[in-house]
From Swiss-Prot:
Induction: Not induced by heat shock or wounding.
Record key words, sorted: ATP-binding, Nucleotide-binding, Transferase, Ubl conjugation pathway
Domain UBC core residues, every copy: 1-147
Species for this entry: Arabidopsis thaliana (Mouse-ear cress)
Protein name, UniProt field: SUMO-conjugating enzyme UBC9
Length: 148
């Protein structure tokens, strides 16, 4: 069941890739993908290329995939391990969602952080109290880690 669904999503992604994202299996393992997200142009992550790993559980799509950033990113909803605080990857997951939708949600999270549900409270606090400092730090990290 899971592998059939994953294969279908891969075909759909190749046919109609989401803007500024790409994804596919690592080697022959259909349950382990790598994705690339281009930093949105209207964000401090602009120009960056962010690597993301995707692990599908055996009972996908009834359980959400585990998605994590491999590239360091300065963001209130993404911690130093690359974990992402995104409702659709947790309690808001639905089998109707696809990897394509997940990648688009991550792109919009880069553009519009959610400081009220932070994974990194210090960055959320900076975002709320000194947005210029947050944006310049995020830009610096993007240049340092995502423009290799």
């Amino acid at each position: 069941m899971a592998s059939k669904r994953i294969l279908k999503e891969l075909k759909d992604l190749q046919k109609d890739p989401p803007t500024s994202c790409s994804a596919g299996p690592v080697a022959e393992d259909m349950f382990h993908w790598q994705a690339t997200i281009m930093g949105p142009s209207d964000s401090p992550y602009s120009g960056g290329v962010f690597l993301v790993t995707i692990h599908f559980p055996p009972d996908y799509p009834f359980k959400p995939p585990k998605v994590a950033f491999r590239t360091k990113v300065f963001h209130p909803n993404i911690n130093s391990n690359g974990s992402i605080c995104l409702d659709i990857l947790k309690e808001q997951w639905s089998p109707a969602l696809t990897i394509s939708k997940v990648l688009l949600s991550i792109c919009s999270l880069l553009t519009d952080p959610n400081p009220d549900d932070p994974l990194v409270p210090e960055i959320a606090h900076m975002y709320k109290t000194d947005k210029n400092k947050y944006e310049s730090t995020a830009r610096t990290w993007t240049q340092k880690y995502a423009m290799g």
